[in-house]
Amino acid sequence: MRYLLELSFNGANYHGWQIQPKSVSVQEIIEKCLSIILNEKISIVGAGRTDSGVHASYFCAHFDYSNLIVNKLDFIYKSNSFLPFDISIKNLFEVKDDFHARFGALSRTYQYKLNTFKDPFLANSSYYLKKDIDFYKMNLAALKLYNYQDFKCFSKSNSDVNTFNCIITNASWTFKENHWVFEISANRFLRNMVRAIVGTLIEIGEGKHKINHLDSVIKSKSREEAGYSVPAQGLYLTNIIYPKNTLLDE
């Protein structure tokens, strides 16, 4: 049977989601945990490959298991007892055998948290920017993202992908809980895309470029023309949407 896990994790202590040689990953930790609890070798497939230090307040993964998990609350309790403090299983659902946590997603939402005041307790959870920036200009620039689909300029160099096209459905800055938060939703994202977009918008907010600079960057299709990649600790995956009737439990 195939199961869908809903979980969250603080990425500060991990080299991203995906298993890597000689590095600790979120995927590796969860697979070891589930294999012990279910007494069977378990492999999980995540909804995406978050980079080192990136967090997820909402993340999904699927795995196959030969038996029916009858008591799901007990499974969740045991899983969280085994897992470290910075990874939490939230829910478990039965799904169709052809469900895929990564390729089945219709959209994803990321948030990037930025604070303009120094707080040592936020060092691993947001980006502290010392300079004054104009968030109004940054919001105007962000609106331009809706006009394009090819975002090669924001993709990590030498990315091995079939297409650089993404359909952005939301992109805006808001002030929440003493943070400036950039929220962006799209049908798919390129590697390093969100952090590069945020870095480019910050340079516009700092006055280094005019708002229309974003048009030139996107049309150039060159990573060198875009802004810097902001630090990983401010980035969160916050939502994933799947087609209706994905869950067999419903």
Regions found by a protein language model. Give the residues of each.
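Structured-RNA-binding interfaces characteristic of tRNA pseudouridine synthases
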Residues: M1-E250
